[in-house]
Amino acid sequence: MKVTKVTRQIRKMLPLKSCGAVIVAAGNATRMGGIDKVMAPIDREPMIVHTVRAFQESDVIRQIVIVTRQELIVPVMDLCSGFDKVHAVVVGGSDRVESVCAGLQALSNDMKLVAVHDGARPFISWQVIDRTVRAAHTYGAAAPGVPVKDTIKIVQGGVVRGTPDRSTLQAIQTPQVFDAALLKGALKKATLENAPITDDCSAVERMGMSVKIVEGDERNIKIATPLDLQLAELLKKETL
């Protein structure tokens, strides 16, 4: 524990580009069976509060923009009023790319790095935020990943067409952190070309940019189903 505290103090003294966080919580959660996952309680607090708190308490995040649905603007603003890093709460778009772009537009121009994070990943740790931001400071683009445990099959028409080498596969998490100008340009290009984008790394990869992968955290799960929400309650109890 002492080593962790000392390491954190040393890292705080190292100069970093200013980094703002865009927390995307604008989806409709069609797999949640009618549960609004933004407001879904985990240990009696809405999920979005847990997520925002992690970035509020991070030493490497200067500013936070939350992107959500129109009807949640006021409730989210009220819930996050005690977090002084929250710069704005804005309305998302029709898809993830539009929502991320809305968040980028709301960030201050002096944020040279941007960390894009899923609002439905409430168990993000300061360690993962820290090492991803620092990697992006060095490489321009970075994301956390964890090794894939299951065997992955390429399936077409219900038939297996191939089995990728599992040792080369990683499940990519968020926050995904980029040079702000790079991400803005990559998303603009993807939008103009109507390119399918599954995450922000995909947009940057299309520009020929390499993304540095850092160690993620298996606890950094994305809440996408009611079962995930039950698992989240168990994970939260473990930390109490």
Which residues does each PLM region occupy?
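Short active-site oxyanion
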Residues: V60-V65, H87, G140, R219-N220
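Short, high-confidence coil segments that cap the C-terminus of an alpha-helix
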Residues: I61, M111, T138-A141, M209, ...
